[in-house]
Amino acid sequence: MDLKTAVFNAARDGKLRLLTKLLASKSKAEVSSLISEKTNGATPLLMAARYGHLDMVEFLLEQCSASIEVGGSVNFDGETIEGAPPLWAASAAGHLKVVQSLLNHGASVNNTTLTNSTPLRAACFDGHLEIVKYLVEHKADLEVSNRHGHTCLMISCYKGHKEIAQYLLEKGADVNRKSVKGNTALHDCAESGSLDIMKMLLMYCAKMEKDGYGMTPLLSASVTGHTNIVDFLTHHAQTSKTERINALELLGATFVDKKRDLLGALKYWKKAMNMRYSDRTNIISKPVPQTLIMAYDYAKEVNSAEELEGLIADPDEMRMQALLIRERILGPSHPDTSYYIRYRGAVYADSGNFKRCINLWKYALDMQQSNLDPLSPMTASSLLSFAELFSFMLQDRAKGLLGTTVTFDDLMGILCKSVLEIERAIKQTQCPADPLQLNKALSIILHLICLLEKVPCTVEQDHFKKQTIYRFLKLHPRGKNNFSPLHLAVDKNTTCVGRYPVCKFPSLQVTAILIECGADVNVRDSDDNSPLHIAALNNHPDIMNLLIKSGAHFDATNLHKQTASDLLDEKEIAKNLIQPINHTTLQCLAARVIVNHRIYYKGNIPEKLETFVSLHR
């Protein structure tokens, strides 16, 4: 174990005597260097503060001049917090004496993590009331929110820490402050079921506001299934009759899909139906749908007590009612609407009803693409689920275990929607696509193409497939490390796209169809590797031969001046199958001489040859 690690471990474990020995013979500069260095992203002081070693903290500050504000990585409940200062770590862990010492030594009370979380927020999160009080007494700002706009009061409400919430309110915390998504502290109480805190907030004049999705605290409670909050708010003076009805109907939908309690759902739906008809002079009927939805098996919402009673004998119809109600009340843009449609589809798939699953998932995907930003993780998850489902169906079909077939139209429809997602992302120039999300979407598309190659099709269908792939390639999309689709097709890492296996990469079939549809075989990634370089790294001679036959330049070099041949594993059979001499021309040898001898050629030879020579740099 090196000295740096030994110093770090001693500080983390609170072994002051050992640390003193380790540093005894070191110069001031050496001590400073050892104490300031990070191990696993954290300084010795940060670890000492995290684990509450007061004597160690004071020794590091007073004897070693450790920097009191330098942040680092700390782990809480399995989550790594980046950029956490020592005061934040001590506050989160509940070490009051360490917090007091750090502040006495000049620590900034409002110094934040990378996500803009303050020490006060950290103490509020885990319910450390005495630390909260001490920080506030030392001028901690109650209103500093994290990157999501979530305040100390909000997190106290969400975590159910009533005494802390009360203390913050007494100290003047803004009870109606909104997060980035428009949530208030009342929403946090509703989502966590903290009824007592909600009552207290209302005493401090909290307002029933809607969030960014148009959700009131009452609807938030209905979505999360907190009946105590729903019962309380449906009797609140600020709640209208229509809001009460919607809340009860939505709560019933939650009982169906989240709690899996059909009788409980009926109880709340009956309450809502009785409210609709309670005033015979002013019956509140459900809106008449303009069209019936095929994915919901053309179900209609029940509109009378008699129709509601009829649902008892048809559990499947009840589940469709839940989806209809949720879409009507929350709208298509709310994440829960598409989430539970997908959930219901997955349940159908588990029971072998793949047709119902595909119809529901397609409907959810259309909803997501119409309402979410391009390459949203939720949309990517839907596309991946389709790829995994189709792969499973094709495997079981091949084994003769499954009667249902995967049709070309099903697969092609999802490929088209996947390409549409890339088009949407590339058109959004003001906000460039996240490379990791784009890489995932590109990988999913390649898996879908791979699956399509296993499905029989007509000449017209084959033409449409290649036309779509051509359109996809013309978008010139790039993934991680600036990989083109062809780079991804020849890389083994493309195999790992989700939890379940879909297709195996490198894929000769996918590579072949990409080339046939116009993929550039000499395209470069950020390390100047061509697809041939990546195929060589993956030791796939068949793909290398295909790329070379299709015009890939064999002795082109990458950023590290390596050819594809240099990257082949000598132990692999590929070395024997790819003979450099068979693919090296006199023109290549001349270009190498020019590059190796640094002969100035720009402007002295035709532009086309300049490009050729540059391939050999």
Curated annotation (Swiss-Prot):
TPR repeats lie at residues 245-279, 338-371. It comes from the Eukaryota. InterPro entries: Ankyrin_rpt (IPR002110), Ankyrin_rpt-contain_sf (IPR036770), TPR-like_helical_dom_sf (IPR011990). Widely expressed. Expressed at higher level in testis. GO terms for molecular function: ubiquitin-like ligase-substrate adaptor activity. Pathway: Protein modification; protein ubiquitination. Keywords: Acetylation, ANK repeat, Repeat, TPR repeat, Ubl conjugation pathway. It holds the Pfam family Ank_2. The modification N-acetylmethionine is found at M1. GO terms for biological process: proteasome-mediated ubiquitin-dependent protein catabolic process; protein ubiquitination; ubiquitin-dependent protein catabolic process via the C-end degron rule pathway. ANK repeats lie at residues 2-31, 40-70, 82-111, 115-144, 148-177, 181-210, 213-242, 481-523, 527-556. GO terms for cellular component: Cul2-RING ubiquitin ligase complex; cytosol; nucleoplasm. Substrate-recognition component of a Cul2-RING (CRL2) E3 ubiquitin-protein ligase complex of the DesCEND (destruction via C-end degrons) pathway, which recognizes a C-degron located at the extreme C terminus of target proteins, leading to their ubiquitination and degradation. The C-degron recognized by the DesCEND pathway is usually a motif of less than ten residues and can be present in full-length proteins, truncated proteins or proteolytically cleaved forms. The first seven ANK repeats at the N-terminus (1-242) are essnetial for recognition of Lys/Arg-Xaa-Arg and -Lys/Arg-Xaa-Xaa-Arg C-degrons. Component of a Cul2-RING (CRL2) E3 ubiquitin-protein ligase complex, also named ECS (Elongin BC-CUL2/5-SOCS-box protein) complex, composed of CUL2, Elongin BC (ELOB and ELOC), RBX1 and substrate-specific adapter FEM1C. PANTHER family: ANKYRIN REPEAT CONTAINING (PTHR24173), ANKYRIN REPEAT DOMAIN-CONTAINING PROTEIN 16 (PTHR24173:SF74). Belongs to the fem-1 family. Insertion of the beta Geo promoter trap into the Fem1c gene is the cause of ROSA3 mice. Adult ROSA3 mice exhibit widespread expression of the trap gene in epithelial cells found in most organs. Although normal processing of the Fem1c transcript is disrupted in homozygous ROSA3 mice, some tissues show low levels of a partially processed transcript containing exons 2 and 3, which contain the entire coding region of Fem1c. ROSA3 mice show no adverse effects in their sexual development or fertility or in the attenuation of neuronal cell death. This is Protein fem-1 homolog C.
